[in-house]
């Protein structure tokens, strides 16, 4: 049984790897004999005792080789190996006997590997510069009935081949290390834009082991901000020019937390919503990281420290497991409206004339329209030309109506649409026939739930209007 100190060292390695996502890099070297090649892969894996029914079944460990340089195709687009010759990669997971089940089936690519118990041997013949073309495949680990919190082991990867100098790699495995699920949030009844959401943030450690130190990360899109300045939090407001960027707060908590236990904040975390906010995205997560090491990482960034009282973690006597998940997100507020407005023009023209017609698009607010959940895809409106006319020039973001469409053109408006946005779409129309009061229109062919004034969702385009037209 490993010592508590050894287990905590493993926990620290796992947590920092998950938080910082660091990767080792090697400078390019001139090829020489023997060719130096490194085995690549994660440094550690925290094997969960928590069986998520919706969890991934993909390998947690992806292995590869890294050789000097980068792959460069020739003039025909063909990339050639920098070494050709037999070599063997040996993956030894013997120390995981009784700790975890090991699946080598995704290892070795089309060649596959020969497996003897918990040892896999994989042959190869080519090595390319860099690592993109040197993937070895994946290893899947799963807990068994014998697995227990605190069990440790490792996977040792070595390789050998003539003319090659390999550097091996070791993946440390810890069973049941700290695994923090986040409390799900809900918008309060009657919540409106401009209100402050007192977010009851918290986590549940479903790992069998406790830990020392927690990092809280909170982020929010343009309509959200964090008005408090807690003394153990660091803040990075959104760049005003980055409309789809996020504000972020990072909070560090000292002290130990237990396994199979839930914790909340000593006071709610306030999230201020702007008057234009609508379906803005808030997300947060707790990560097990030693406080001193978290502060070292923060010192390398641009976050500014808070100056108020410190937040604290409070152990909760009871917590419904169903109220916690790996991802915690909330869209707030859901109650607000925008006012999209389409306008046309009234013009006079003779037969054969070509006229410019401006279709105006505006948002009179109060809310912006961002469509954050759909990746900022554009919205569209339809255009029917006045009878007796032909479009000679069409705005860049407009397309002819497709088969089955009733509109002559569809125009696309990129999002986000700000709360005071205005845009103009100019068509060139040739008058083929003079028709009194020839009327077209620009309109939205669908209903928008948060539209505050549907009455101005269409605008008329009138050529040669009569006094009564």
Where are these regions (language model features)?
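Secretory targeting and sorting signals
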Residues: 1-32
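Low-complexity, acidic Ser/Thr/Pro-rich repeat tracts that form intrinsically disordered stalk/linker regions
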Residues: 28-58, 65, 101-116
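Extracellular/luminal low-complexity Ser/Thr/Pro-rich, glycosylation-prone repeat/linker regions
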Residues: 31-37, 145, 155-181, 285-342, ...
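A surface/secretory-pathway sequence property marking extracellular, secreted
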Residues: 32-34, 82-126, 214-258, 333, ...
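Short beta-strand elements of extracellular/lumenal beta-sandwich folds
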Residues: 41-85, 187-210, 343-375
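Hydrophobic beta-strand positions in extracellular immunoglobulin-like domains
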Residues: 63-69, 141-143, 159, 202-205, ...
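Low-complexity, intrinsically disordered segments enriched in Ser/Thr together with acidic residues
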Residues: 124-150, 253-282, 290-294, 413-439
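Acidic, serine/threonine- and glycine-rich low-complexity intrinsically disordered segments
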Residues: 202, 214-216, 236-243, 248-367
């Amino acid at each position: 049984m490993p010592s508590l100190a050894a287990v905590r060292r493993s926990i620290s390695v796992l947590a920092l790897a998950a938080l910082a996502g660091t990767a080792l890099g090697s400078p390019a070297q001139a090829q020489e004999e023997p060719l130096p090649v490194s085995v690549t892969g994660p440094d550690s894996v925290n094997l969960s005792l928590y069986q998520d029914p919706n969890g991934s079944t993909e390998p947690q460990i992806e292995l590869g080789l890294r050789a000097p340089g980068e792959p460069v195709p020739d003039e025909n687009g063909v990339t050639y190996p920098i070494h050709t010759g037999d070599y063997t990669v040996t993956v030894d997971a013997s120390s995981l006997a009784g700790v975890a089940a090991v699946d080598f089936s995704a290892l070795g690519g089309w060649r596959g590997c020969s497996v003897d118990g918990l040892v896999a041997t994989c042959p190869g013949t080519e090595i390319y510069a860099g690592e993109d073309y040197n993937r070895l495949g994946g290893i899947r680990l799963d807990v068994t009935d014998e697995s227990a919190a605190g069990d440790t082991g490792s996977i040792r990867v070595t390789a050998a081949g003539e003319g090659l100098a390999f550097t091996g790699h070791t993946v440390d495995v810890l069973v049941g290390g700290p695994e923090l699920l986040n409390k799900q949030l809900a918008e309060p009844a009657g919540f409106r834009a401009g209100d402050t959401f007192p977010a009851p943030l918290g986590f549940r450690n479903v790992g069998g082991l406790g830990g020392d130190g927690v990092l809280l990360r909170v982020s929010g899109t343009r309509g959200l901000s964090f008005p408090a300045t807690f003394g153990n939090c660091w803040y990075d407001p959104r760049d005003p020019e980055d409309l789809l960027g996020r504000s972020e707060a990072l909070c560090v908590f000292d002290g130990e937390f237990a396994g199979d236990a839930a914790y909340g904040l000593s006071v709610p975390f306030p999230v201020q919503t702007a008057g234009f906010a609508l379906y803005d995205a808030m997300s947060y997560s707790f990560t097990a990281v030693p406080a001193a090491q978290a502060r070292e990482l923060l010192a390398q960034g641009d976050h500014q420290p808070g100056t108020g009282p410190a937040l604290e973690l409070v152990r909760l006597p009871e917590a419904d497991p169903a109220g916690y998940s790996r991802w915690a997100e909330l869209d707030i507020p859901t109650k607000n409206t925008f006012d999209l407005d389409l306008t046309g023009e009234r013009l006079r023209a003779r037969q054969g004339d070509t006229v410019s017609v401006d279709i105006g698009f505006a948002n009179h607010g109060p809310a912006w329209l961002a469509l954050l959940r759909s990746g900022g895809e554009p919205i569209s409106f339809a255009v029917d030309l006045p009878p007796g006319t032909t479009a000679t020039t069409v705005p860049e973001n407009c397309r002819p109506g497709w088969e089955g469409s009733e509109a002559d053109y569809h125009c696309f408006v990129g999002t986000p649409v700000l709360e005071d946005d205005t845009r103009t779409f100019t068509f060139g129309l040739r008058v083929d026939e003079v028709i009194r009061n020839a009327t077209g229109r620009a309109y939205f062919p669908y209903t928008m739930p948060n539209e505050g004034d549907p009455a101005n969702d269409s605008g008329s385009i009138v050529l040669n209007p009569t006094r009564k037209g």
